[in-house]
């Protein structure tokens, strides 16, 4: 095995890109280093940066489709090879780049026969398509394929509501995250009290922004989160006369579990990493050591399985359930926590 060598600063804290490549129109990769850091600083920065990269950066997605000719989501239309549901899933995968604030409208109007791709979407001037070749539908007959689209810029996830819409509109589960994945690793060097660290950060994006842009946006978001602490006044440190207090309801484990089981949703479990939820560092590290990285990995373990993890406690399972209820409505199988 050949050991890689990188040149690092010995005094001034600096970062630089050591690798950058474009694997496809919808997959960019970048690797960065930050050094020199004192012992423990690399892990602190790496964990915060990964969470910011995966959860704090905004992206643009198609969140709703409107067509008055479609009776319901799982119907089929004569002259179109795909079902309505398949078309919605294809539209969900369209990668957009924009400076949009809030929501905007777009449309598609194509006459068959032929293929409908992302390049057929009529967009406002401030929205771009990353990959024009992305497939949407196959028209097998000379029919008009006309639909309206709602585009939204946001962060995290948008889970569609379960009820039917009478106006012919169909919401789409949206994953706004432009960063597909992010990892960090640490290399230590030096001896004794002179020991220092190098932080490596790897970033994969969907092409709507480069890894370097993602690193910049994540850094800015972290800075914005910490700025209020610099302007904190002494008078604001304590609550007086019970003002601005929030009552907390008692936690009942079985009630929480029953509520989660009752509410059923389908979401992209493989795309949700456990460190994007607000788990404590201790719980996250315990799960990571057991090769549990995504929500799908987590839900494939029963309560008994989790209790076998070293240093895992029943209070940790309660915290996980609380977070699942807060952010997701999930179909939990019987005997799964």
UniProtKB/Swiss-Prot annotation:
Residues 1-233 are annotated as: Alpha N-terminal domain (alpha-NTD). Residues 265-337 are annotated as: Alpha C-terminal domain (alpha-CTD). One of its GO terms (cellular component) is DNA-directed RNA polymerase complex. The keyword Cell division does not apply. One of its GO terms (molecular function) is protein dimerization activity. Its main location: plastid. Pfam families: RNA_pol_A_bac, RNA_pol_A_CTD, RNA_pol_L. It is found in: Plastid, Chloroplast. InterPro entries: DNA-dir_RNA_pol_insert, DNA-dir_RNA_pol_RpoA/D/Rpb3, DNA-dir_RpoA, RBP11-like, RNAP_asu_C, RNApol_insert_sf. Keywords: Chloroplast, DNA-directed RNA polymerase, Nucleotidyltransferase, Plastid, Transcription, Transferase. Its EC number is 2.7.7.6. It catalyses: RNA(n) + a ribonucleoside 5'-triphosphate = RNA(n+1) + diphosphate. The keyword Chloroplast applies. GO terms for biological process: DNA-templated transcription. Belongs to the RNA polymerase alpha chain family. In plastids the minimal PEP RNA polymerase catalytic core is composed of four subunits: alpha, beta, beta', and beta''. When a (nuclear-encoded) sigma factor is associated with the core the holoenzyme is formed, which can initiate transcription. DNA-dependent RNA polymerase catalyzes the transcription of DNA into RNA using the four ribonucleoside triphosphates as substrates. The N-terminal domain is essential for RNAP assembly and basal transcription, whereas the C-terminal domain is involved in interaction with transcriptional regulators and with upstream promoter elements. This is DNA-directed RNA polymerase subunit alpha. It comes from Solanum lycopersicum.
């Amino acid at each position: 095995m050949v050991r890689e060598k990188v040149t690092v600063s010995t005094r001034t804290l600096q970062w630089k890109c050591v690798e950058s490549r474009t694997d496809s129109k919808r997959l960019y990769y970048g690797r960065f280093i930050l050094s020199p850091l004192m012992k423990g600083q690399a892990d602190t920065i790496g964990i915060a940066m990964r969470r910011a990269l995966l959860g704090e950066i905004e992206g643009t997605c198609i969140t709703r489709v409107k067509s008055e000719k479609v009776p319901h989501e799982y119907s089929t239309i004569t002259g179109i090879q795909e079902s309505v549901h398949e078309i919605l899933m294809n539209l969900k995968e369209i990668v957009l780049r924009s400076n949009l604030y809030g929501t905007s409208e777009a449309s598609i109007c194509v006459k068959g026969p032929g293929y409908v791709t992302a390049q057929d979407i009529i967009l406002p001037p401030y929205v771009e398509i990353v990959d024009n070749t992305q497939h949407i539908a196959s028209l097998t007959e000379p029919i008009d394929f006309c639909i309206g689209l709602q585009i939204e810029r946001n962060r995290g996830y948008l889970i569609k509501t379960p009820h039917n819409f009478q106006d012919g509109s169909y919401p789409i589960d949206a994953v706004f995250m432009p960063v597909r994945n992010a990892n960090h690793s640490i290399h230590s060097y030096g001896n004794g009290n002179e020991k220092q660290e190098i932080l490596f950060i790897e970033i994969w994006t969907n092409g709507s922004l480069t890894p370097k842009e993602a690193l910049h946006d994540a850094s800015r978001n972290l800075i914005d989160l910490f700025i209020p602490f610099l302007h904190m006044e002494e008078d604001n440190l304590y609550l007086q006369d019970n003002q601005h207090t929030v009552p907390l309801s008692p936690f009942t484990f079985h009630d929480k579990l029953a509520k989660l089981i009752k509410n059923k949703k389908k979401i992209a479990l493989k795309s949700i990493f456990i460190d994007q939820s607000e788990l404590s560092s201790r719980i996250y590290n315990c799960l990571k050591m057991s090769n549990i990285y995504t929500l799908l990995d987590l839900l494939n373990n029963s309560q008994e399985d989790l209790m076998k993890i070293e240093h895992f406690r029943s209070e940790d399972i309660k915290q996980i359930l609380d977070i699942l209820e807060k952010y997701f409505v999930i179909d939990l199988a019987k005997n799964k926590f």
